[in-house]
Amino acid sequence: MRTANVILALVLLATACGGGAAVSTTTTLPPTTTLPPTTTTTTLPPTTTTTTTLPPTTTTTTTTTTTTTTTTTTTTTTTTTTTTTTLPPRPPTIDELLALDQPLNLAHAGGDQDHPHSTMYAFRRAAEAGVDLLEMDVRITADGVLVVHHDADVFGTTGGEGVVAEMTVAELQALDNAWWWSPTCWPCRDLADGDYPFRGVRTGVVEPPEGFTPDDFRIETFRSVAEAFPTLALDVEIKNRDDHAEAAIAALVADLDDLDRRDSVVVVSFSSDVVAAFKEVAPDVATSPGTDEMIAWILGGEALGDHPVVQVPPNYDGIEVLMEAFFTAVEEAGVEVWVWPDSTDQEAGGFYAELLDLGIDGIIAGRPAAFEQVLQDGGYVG
């Protein structure tokens, strides 16, 4: 009875839902998967999107975009390190001087006819005149130092007593090296005191010329002279020919090496033995031959040694040197000729000009300023 009632209720419910079809219990539902897009248009009420339009929060986060426009101006400071290595001044080499192909002006003892022989004062005056080389004589002292001095003793220029080789540098430099010099008569010994203008300057009795000191009138060391004139070449005569020659040669070579002066010096001696001994220890230094070698070359027809220049007087022992045979030998040997006047009366512009006319390559002048004027006037130098 209860079952019948249930069936009746189900039938009535199906009819009420509008289904007139038979209630096929097969319930063939569509495949659950392919459900149509549940477009659940849940039309919600306008969600008043509170766009809280806040006032421009002038949070000027001052991102001060410090436009550090890091314009990385890569200023590639190409530090062109111009290392101006200020090199010390250098004198011309002897080869460079000879290559000039023009007469050279050599100041004999600094220009002994114009200034006190072999003093720093004379050498400075010669440099001011524009000479090419400074000519000087050297001797060894008792304490092994090379000094610039002509004679074996000191009387000739200082009026003092003593032998250079037996005196120390200190003893020599205490002397007045301008004692006997006179512009009117060099080397006269019998003039009035007033005719010796620089007498007493070394000892402080007389004021030195402006720009100079008492030391400029003393016997000077070779090294000091060479250091004082770094841009001038030197013509150095070794005066020692005795037992002191070896010491003089050693001292000269040592000074040349210390000063890096080997290529800007010509070394000469009257003694061929001294020149040969020097060449043994310094074969790369320019030299001029000694007397014996010169005679054997000119008169004996022997070959001249390795010398770029010969130095001669116009006359030697009463014999005229500057003759045709001499110049023929010079041309064949391919050497330069430097002449040193052998008397005071030859120390003048006229005689200098005569020598130049002969084709002389250089003059060891006692008046270098006068010779420089001859060179300028004759158009020999630029």
Located regions from the model:
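Phosphate-group recognition and catalysis centered on beta-loop-alpha active-site segments
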Residues: 18-23, 85-382
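C-terminal motif of bacterial Sec signal peptides marking the signal peptidase cleavage site
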Residues: 13-16
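Extracellular mucin-like PTS domains
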Residues: 24-87
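A periodicity- and composition-biased signal for non-globular, repetitive helical segments
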Residues: 8, 61-62, 114
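Sec-dependent signal peptide recognition
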Residues: 2-9
